[in-house]
């Protein structure tokens, strides 16, 4: 996993902090991070390296797991967390609703890490076969956009299917018991369904969506504590490089 620091954002952040004089202020006591069941933040949490680095600045780390990007963005918006990672779609809705966010880093596109799945014995063979069927998804997430694009590619309208909005765990349960006909989801839920349930992939994001991931901070927190954010992003990048060099160790996390 290769993390790209959005240098213009960080440069603007530091410049703003200098102009406001906040770099001389006391550091935050706690950095509250929102994460999901995938990606570099999971590895960072497991390794514990961030806690050691920030302890030198007198800052503790608090981790909160979220079921999906929209829920994490709500946490950022209401101020229950200071930093998190999500796909490209949820921040669009959050910022449209007035969320004051700063993009500080990104991961490379991963179009195969989300997919539209059906049960292994389903008679559904293509996206076009979904007409009139029930599809489970996490509303407002990256997979919501994948579903729209996949339907469009197959010549279907969004209104041609029945959407069932469920968080990942509930969607998996509905998928297993046959309460829905298809499920559009991301890794690691996607991989688990493929391996444990032998779910079939109708369409992943290749060629129709990028599935980008962005690291975001609330702008007020980032402006008041730029050194904390810089340290965090540096640790994210370091863990990303470590994961590339140690794939066997990553599977043990």
Question: Predicted segment positions?
Answer:
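Bacterial N-terminal signal peptides that target proteins for export
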Residues: 1-13
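Hydrophobic helical h-region of N-terminal Sec-dependent signal peptides
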Residues: 10-22
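A broadly conserved amphipathic alpha-helix scaffold signal in soluble, globular proteins
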Residues: 14, 148-152, 191
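Sec/Tat signal peptide C-region and signal peptidase I cleavage site
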Residues: 22-28
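Short, glycine-/small- and polar/acidic-enriched structural segments
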Residues: 29-157, 162-165, 181-185, 202, ...
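Pocket-lining segment of extracytoplasmic ligand-binding domains
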Residues: 89, 160-164, 169-253
């Amino acid at each position: 996993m290769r993390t790209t620091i959005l240098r213009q954002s960080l440069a603007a952040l530091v410049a703003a902090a200098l102009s406001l004089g906040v770099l001389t202020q006391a550091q935050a006591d706690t950095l509250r991070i929102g994460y999901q069941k995938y990606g570099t933040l999971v590895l960072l949490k497991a390794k514990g390296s961030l806690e050691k680095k920030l302890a030198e600045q007198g800052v503790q780390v608090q981790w909160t797991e979220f079921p999906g990007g929209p829920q994490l963005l709500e946490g950022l918006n209401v101020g229950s967390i200071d930093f998190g990672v999500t796909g490209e779609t949820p921040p669009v809705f959050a910022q449209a609703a007035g969320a004051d966010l700063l993009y500080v880093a990104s991961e490379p596109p991963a179009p195969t890490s989300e997919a539209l799945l059906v049960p292994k014995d389903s008679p559904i063979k293509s996206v076009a076969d979904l007409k009139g069927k029930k599809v489970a998804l996490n509303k407002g997430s990256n997979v919501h956009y994948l579903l729209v694009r996949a339907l469009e590619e197959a010549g279907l309208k969004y209104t041609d299917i029945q959407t069932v909005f469920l968080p990942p765990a509930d969607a998996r349960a509905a998928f297993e018991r046959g309460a829905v006909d298809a499920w559009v989801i991301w890794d690691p839920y996607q991989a688990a369904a493929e391996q444990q349930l032998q779910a079939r992939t109708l369409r992943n994001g290749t060629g129709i969506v990028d599935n980008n991931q962005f690291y975001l901070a609330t702008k007020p927190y980032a402006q008041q504590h730029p050194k904390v954010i810089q340290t965090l992003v540096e640790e994210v990048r370091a863990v990303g490089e470590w994961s590339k060099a140690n794939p066997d160790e990553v599977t043990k996390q």
